[in-house]
Amino acid sequence: MKLEMSSYLHKVPNTGITNLSNSKSIVFIMFCATLLFIITSSRYLTGSESLGQIPSEIPKSSEQLNEELSQQINSKLHKLASFDKFNSFPLLNKHMKDDIYGLMTLETFTDPLPYLENYNEEEYSQQNYPICSEKLMFPSKIKLTKQQYLPADLQQFLGVLNNMRPYHDMVEKAKAYFISDLREEKKWFRFAGSSIWLPQFQCHYMVSRYLYSPNGVANHAFASFLYIQLFDSDWKELPSHTTLDIPFEQTEANSIFKIFKPKQKYANFRNSTYPQILPIPFDYKLPIETKKYYYGPEDPRILLRSNPLGFDEPLIVFNMKGLKLTKRVMYSYLPFSNTLKLLKKRREPFANIEKNWTPFKSVAQPSKTQTTIHFIYSMIPLEVLACDIDSGLCDILQKPAKHDFNYVGGLRGGTQLVSLPLNETIPSEIRAKLPIPKNRQVYIGWARTHLNNCGCGDSMYRPNFITLVEDYDDVTDKYYYKIGDISGYFDFAAKIEPWSKQVLDEEGNLYEKAEQCQGRNVLIPNSIAYWDVGSIKLAGTEYQKHDFKDMFSSGKVSDFNANEIVFNDYMGVTLSSADRDVSIVHVKGLLNYILQLPSLVDDSLVINKEWTFQKKGHDLNVRCAMIASKEYCKSYAIKQGVKIDEKSEET
């Protein structure tokens, strides 16, 4: 069975022409055949059964917008784009006070290239590489807050779900099939909250995954749904029925005489009410022999995309199982415009499972960032893609040698990657002093490593800080990528809930059992919700963001050295533990640490040749991080009272 998104199939218009010429008759016949094909094969992306979430305000226009309406839309677009960048900040002052931040050690392992001339495979193959601690480790203290939980009202979610008839009917069928005495609230799990800051609307836009599990076990999902909430700069959810006037892409309708022409797109506006469930269509079947259902969108990640029509909009990527494809694949979705695209490599088949693609927006070529989205397809070994947003087709920018086409390493997924917050609000005089090599871009994120049998339960998941370095060779017009720095496990001092499962007692009663280091032990980083500079210190004087605009023109600042620059930057990282919650931790001063990393600022480490990726030992920093992660796992298990088995672990 197919759950369908809202669609509008237009009838053939009455042209008033009774005697068509042969050429027009051919065009008309071809149009009818095309329309018949669309209708009969629309089980995947279109259909008459609406999910009821995206309202009819998204029309397909058969004519160009009239001049008056165009002026109104352009006025709205101008107003959105002209918000005060110097007085917009994603965090209230109370979340920026020093006394709420504690210190935690972050240890990253940097680029090993300078140490590979005398590379000794035997020496470096030891379990505890001396090079890790002696040469590659770069430790520092970073500031972070206690985690803040970001809840959702289950009854409110169910109210929205019940108004979307296909979703509601599917869940009711599942309830009738999976007989269970569990209370309804025990069957629903919300986690994987991924968020971005919408400065034009002064709110945080969060997508999270609501999972329905009839037996109350998080990793026995029947179906998942994507839920949108809005939060203010205090990270309080905005009231129910909050409405935004959002921009979207309006597409012209089919026309007899424009069948083979690209459809024209226009910017328009509509009202959108929150919270809401995204109307993602998906296949489902009940029952199936394997009893492995897992229908619907999973693991959403989000970033902000600059639409060529002149507005910024969220772009969500997720993986989803399809009955037609008989496998899990990746999709992109534009919620403002209700546009869903399957993502696929242009000249390669699907792998057995497509998931954990790490999205980022390349800032090297701003004109292309409007139409493409980049991904780390694989971290070990490193493979990078660029995908066209309109078609979903992906080109390989950097492809490593892989012995197994379907290989997926332990390091994968995590948050999206973001560029350093050195945007146009930072004075150009300051940016010019920073020691980043020419034609280099730096992206950072929090990946996560999946370790099996490392000491705590069956498997452990924790965040790992990473930097992705992008070097451009203007002679060959080619981009090169590398993992510049990577940390071992870093848990943000967050509370990690034990994995929960339903078990029977001696009398046959079902109860919930949750113990640390039993089953999975999970803390997943889901998004960098924001990253911005609140103030800058120069030679001991602090300048707030609203001062950046005229710091130098007003004569407040004279000459200065790069080592006199101190950024007070703030980053929000959203987390989920045990597939059952959403929280956020605020991090302060990370930018200063990053700007000291040798892999980012050393000109001798600029990549401009393929051989760099073929030198033995080029991935030593990643290996060091994996060793450190395993040591964390053992240490964590010991603290939980687990007796460590010294058998070899597998990743």
From Swiss-Prot:
Membrane topology: Single-pass type II membrane protein
Any single GO BP term: cell wall organization
InterPro entries: BMT1
Residue stretches spanning the membrane: 20-42
Pfam families noted in UniProt: BMT (PF12141)
Membrane topology (Cytoplasmic): 1-19
GO molecular function, one term: mannosyltransferase activity
Intracellular or extracellular location(s): Membrane
Glycosites: N271, N423
Induction, as annotated: Expression is induced by HAP43 and down-regulated in an azole-resistant strain.
Major site of localization recorded for this protein: membrane
Position of the signal peptide: none
EC number, as in UniProt: 2.4.1.-
One GO CC term, this protein: membrane
Keywords: Cell wall biogenesis/degradation, Glycoprotein, Glycosyltransferase, Membrane, Signal-anchor, Transferase, Transmembrane, Transmembrane helix
Extracellular-side segments: 43-651
Function: Beta-mannosyltransferase involved in cell wall biosynthesis through beta-1,2-mannosylation of cell wall phosphopeptidomannan.
Family of the protein in this entry: Belongs to the BMT family.
The name this protein goes by in its record: Beta-mannosyltransferase 7
Organism: Candida albicans (strain SC5314 / ATCC MYA-2876) (Yeast)
Species lineage: Eukaryota, Fungi, Dikarya, Ascomycota, Saccharomycotina
